[in-house]
C-alpha cells in the first residue's frame, strides 16, 4: 500500500462503508453486490484481458465471448433480479461494452412495455436465453432524435395479413443500433405504419433479420457494421436496409395501438405510451452519468494523493498535488456532483417505477412530467458528467492522456450518451415544452403539483425584482433550504423570461414554430435551471434521512459545495434576478474555498466509498493500493511494439535508407 494513501484513509472523519451502504440502498444490498462480485473474481472462467492492446476485431470477439459466458454464469448462479444482473454485468464485462447489451436494455424492456401478453410469451423467454438476440432499430442515417422524420415504412397488406417493410431512401437506412452489425438476429424496428392508404406514424415491429442457426441475413435484409468510431470499439453498431421485407401482422407490438386483420387501425389511449422504452433508458442514463463520473473522480483523486510535484514551501518535500488549491477546485466540485447524481439517479429510478405502475393501472396523469423530467435530466447529467470526466483526465497531467489511466476509455464510452437516446439540446427543448405548458396553466389560474409546483408562485409576482429586494438579506449560504430556494427562484425567473420572450415573438406575427426557434436559447436555459433546481433539491432532501452524524456532516458539506459552486458558475442568473447581491457572491466564492479545505481530509475516503474494484476502474493511476509507478512501467512493457527489440519496419524502410546515405 502506498504510504500516502494509507495516511489519507487514516485521516478520514467518517466510515466509508456507511456511505457505500447508502449508495447501494442498504447494507444488505452492499453484501449481496460484493457476494456477486466475488463469484466472478473467484471464478477461473473469468479472465480480464487488457483491451488496450487488442485490435478492433479482437475486442469484438472478447466482448461476445464475455457476453456468452455472462449468460451461462447468471444461469449457473441463479441471478435473475434486475439489480443483481446489473451488478454482475458491470464486473463481468469490466470495461468492455457488450454487443448483446441492447437485448437487455432496449429489446426486452420494449417487449414488456409495448407487447401484449401473447407477444411477451412468444419472445420474452427466447430473448432472455439469447436464442433471440435483439436490438432496437430506431435511428436512421438521416434522422435521429426527430422521430417524426423517420422514413422506414411498414405497409399493411390485408390479403396476406403481413406488413411490408421498406427502406425507401439512402437516408432511411437504420444506422447506429448497437449489436446490429454482426450480433443480433432480431430487431425491434420503428417504422411509419401505413394501412388502408393512411400513415399513422411510428410504431414498433419485431423483425427477424438473421436466420437462427446459420446467422446469415434473411432475404430482403441488408445488414452490417458501420465501421470504427470515437470509442465503443467492441460494439458492432450497424446498418439495416429492408427491401419489400414481409413480417406477420402479429409482429407489430400491439399492447396499445393495433391493426386488425382487415387493416382497421385502433389508436392507443395516449401516443406518449409508446415512448416507454426511451423514458426507461433515459432514467437509467442519469445513474450511468453518476457511475462514470464517480469512476473518473476516483482515479483522479487517488492519483492526486499519490503524485508529488513542484513545491509550496521551498526546502520541503514535494507536496501531494491534492494539496494544491487549484487541484481541489478542479476535482472536489466534481466529486460533489458525482454524489448529487447518485442520489438523483436513485430518485428518478424510483419515480419511474412508481409512475410506470400507475400507467399500468390506466393513470397517465404523471406521464407528461416523467417524460419531461427524464429528458431534461438525461441531458443535464450527461453534459455535466461528460465535461467532468475530461476535467478529471486533464487533472492527471500527462499520464491522464495514456490509456493506462483508464479515463480515456471512460470518456469515449460515456460521451455518446450526450447524443444517443435523444440529442441533449433537443431533450432540453422537450423539457422546455412541458415547462411552457405548465406556465400557461398557472397563468390561467390552475395550481400545479410535482417538481414544477414552484411556478404556482408566479402570478403573485413574488419573483419580480421589487418584491425580491428583501430576499438578499435572507440568503444564508450555509442553509441548504435557503440555497434550494435560491435555485427555485432562478428556475422560476428563467421559465418566465423564456415564456414572455416566446409570447413576444408570437405577438410579432411569427408562427409558433418560428417563435419557438427564435426563443430556443432562452428555453434551453430555463430547462437547465429547472434540472439544476431538481438536483439540488433531491440532494438536500436526502440528508435528513441519513442516521450517522459523521456521514451526514460530510455529505452536507458536499451538498453545500455542489450548490454554491453552481451559483458561482451561473452567477449572472442569480445576480440579474436579484436573488443574491454582489457582496453575497463574494461570500459564496469564499465559502467554496473553505469547503475545499474541509473536504480535503475526506477526499480519498469519499471515492473509496464508491467501492469500485480495481478491475472495474481499469486504471493504473487509480489503483486502490496506490502503487502507480511500478505498475505503469509493467503496463508499458505489454505494448505489442515491445515484442521485438528491433521492429521489422527498421529492416524494411530505415536500414535501406541509411545504407544509401
Swiss-Prot record:
The modification N6-acetyllysine is found at residues 65, 216, 255, 267, 272, 437, 446, 500, 512, 637, 652. GO terms for molecular function: acyl-CoA oxidase activity; FAD binding; fatty acid binding; palmitoyl-CoA oxidase activity; PDZ domain binding; protein homodimerization activity. The keyword Phosphoprotein applies. Pfam families: ACOX (PF01756), ACOX_C_alpha1 (PF22924), Acyl-CoA_dh_M (PF02770), Acyl-CoA_ox_N (PF14749). Pathway: Lipid metabolism; peroxisomal fatty acid beta-oxidation. The modification Phosphoserine is found at residues 26, 649. Its EC number is 1.3.3.6. GO terms for cellular component: cytoplasm; cytosol; mitochondrion; peroxisomal matrix; peroxisomal membrane; peroxisome. Keywords: Acetylation, FAD, Fatty acid metabolism, Flavoprotein, Lipid metabolism, Oxidoreductase, Peroxisome, Phosphoprotein. A motif (Microbody targeting signal) lies at residues 659-661. FAD binds at residues 139, 178. PANTHER family: ELECTRON TRANSPORT OXIDOREDUCTASE (PTHR10909), PEROXISOMAL ACYL-COENZYME A OXIDASE 1 (PTHR10909:SF250). This is Peroxisomal acyl-coenzyme A oxidase 1. It comes from Mus musculus (Mouse).
Amino acid at each position: 500500500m502506498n504510504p500516502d494513501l494509507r495516511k489519507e484513509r487514516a485521516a478520514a472523519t467518517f466510515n466509508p462503508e456507511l456511505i457505500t451502504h447508502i449508495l447501494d440502498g442498504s447494507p444488505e444490498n452492499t453484501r449481496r453486490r460484493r457476494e456477486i462480485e466475488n463469484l466472478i473474481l473467484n471464478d477461473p472462467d473469468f479472465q480480464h484481458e487488457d483491451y488496450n492492446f487488442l485490435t478492433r476485431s479482437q475486442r469484438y470477439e472478447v466482448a461476445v465471448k464475455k457476453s456468452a459466458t455472462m449468460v451461462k454464469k447468471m444461469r449457473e448462479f441463479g441471478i435473475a433480479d434486475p439489480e443483481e444482473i446489473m451488478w454482475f454485468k458491470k464486473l463481468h464485462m469490466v470495461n468492455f461494452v457488450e454487443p448483446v447489451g441492447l437485448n437487455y436494455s432496449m429489446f426486452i424492456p420494449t417487449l414488456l412495455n409495448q407487447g401484449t401478453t401473447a407477444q411477451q410469451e412468444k419472445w420474452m423467454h427466447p430473448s432472455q436465453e439469447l436464442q433471440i438476440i435483439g436490438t432496437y432499430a430506431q435511428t436512421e442515417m438521416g434522422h435521429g432524435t426527430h422521430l417524426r422524420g423517420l422514413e422506414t415504412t411498414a405497409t399493411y397488406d390485408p390479403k396476406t395479413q403481413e406488413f411490408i417493410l421498406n427502406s425507401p431512401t439512402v437516408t432511411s437506412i437504420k444506422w447506429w443500433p448497437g449489436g446490429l452489425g454482426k450480433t443480433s438476429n432480431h430487431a425491434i424496428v420503428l417504422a411509419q405504419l401505413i394501412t388502408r392508404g393512411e400513415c399513422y406514424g411510428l410504431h414498433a415491429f419485431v423483425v427477424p433479420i438473421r436466420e437462427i442457426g446459420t446467422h446469415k441475413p434473411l432475404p430482403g435484409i441488408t445488414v452490417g457494421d458501420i465501421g470504427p468510431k470515437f470509442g465503443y470499439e467492441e460494439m458492432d453498431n450497424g446498418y439495416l436496409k429492408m427491401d419489400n421485407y414481409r413480417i406477420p401482422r402479429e409482429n407489430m407490438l400491439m399492447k396499445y395501438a393495433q391493426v386488425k386483420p382487415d387493416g382497421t387501425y385502433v389508436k392507443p389511449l395516449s401516443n406518449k405510451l409508446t415512448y416507454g422504452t426511451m423514458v426507461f433508458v433515459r432514467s437509467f442514463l442519469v445513474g450511468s452519468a453518476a457511475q462514470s463520473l464517480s469512476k473518473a473522480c476516483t482515479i483522479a483523486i487517488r492519483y492526486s494523493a499519490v503524485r508529488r510535484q513542484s513545491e509550496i514551501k521551498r526546502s520541503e518535500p514535494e507536496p501531494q498535488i491534492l494539496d494544491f488549491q487549484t487541484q481541489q477546485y478542479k476535482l472536489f466540485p466534481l466529486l460533489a456532483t458525482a454524489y448529487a447524481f447518485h442520489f438523483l439517479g436513485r430518485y428518478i429510478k424510483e419515480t419511474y417505477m412508481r409512475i410506470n405502475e400507475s400507467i399500468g393501472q390506466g393513470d397517465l396523469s404523471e406521464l407528461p412530467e416523467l417524460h419531461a423530467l427524464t429528458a431534461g435530466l438525461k441531458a443535464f447529467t450527461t453534459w455535466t458528467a461528460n465535461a467532468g470526466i475530461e476535467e478529471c483526465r486533464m487533472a492527471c497531467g500527462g499520464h491522464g492522456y495514456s490509456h493506462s489511466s483508464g479515463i480515456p476509455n471512460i470518456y469515449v464510452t460515456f460521451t455518446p450518451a450526450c447524443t444517443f437516446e435523444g440529442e441533449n439540446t433537443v431533450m432540453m427543448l422537450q423539457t422546455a415544452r412541458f415547462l411552457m405548458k405548465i406556465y400557461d396553466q398557472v397563468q390561467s389560474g390552475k395550481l400545479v403539483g410535482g417538481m414544477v409546483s414552484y411556478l404556482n408562485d408566479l402570478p403573485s409576482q413574488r419573483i419580480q425584482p421589487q418584491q425580491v429586494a428583501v430576499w438578499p438579506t435572507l440568503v444564508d449560504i450555509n442553509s441548504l433550504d435557503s440555497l434550494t430556494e435560491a435555485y427555485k427562484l432562478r428556475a422560476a425567473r428563467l421559465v418566465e423570461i423564456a415564456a414572455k420572450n416566446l409570447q413576444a415573438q408570437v405577438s410579432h406575427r411569427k408562427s409558433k414554430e418560428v417563435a419557438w426557434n427564435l426563443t430556443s436559447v432562452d428555453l434551453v436555459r430555463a430547462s437547465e435551471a429547472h434540472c439544476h433546481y431538481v438536483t439540488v433539491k433531491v440532494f438536500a432532501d436526502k440528508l435528513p434521512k441519513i442516521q450517522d452524524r459523521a456521514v451526514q456532516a460530510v455529505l452536507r458539506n458536499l451538498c453545500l459545495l455542489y450548490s454554491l459552486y453552481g451559483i458561482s458558475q451561473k452567477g449572472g442568473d442569480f445576480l440579474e434576478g436579484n436573488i443574491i447581491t454582489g457582496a453575497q457572491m463574494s461570500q459564496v466564492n469564499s465559502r467554496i474555498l473553505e469547503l475545499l479545505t474541509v473536504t480535503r481530509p475526506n477526499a480519498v475516503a469519499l471515492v473509496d466509498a464508491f467501492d469500485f474494484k480495481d478491475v472495474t476502474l481499469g486504471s493504473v493511476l487509480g489503483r486502490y493500493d496506490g502503487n502507480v509507478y511500478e505498475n505503469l512501467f509493467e503496463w508499458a512493457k505489454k505494448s505489442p511494439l515491445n515484442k521485438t527489440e528491433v521492429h521489422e519496419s527498421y529492416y524494411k524502410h530505415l536500414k535501406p535508407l541509411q545504407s544509401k546515405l
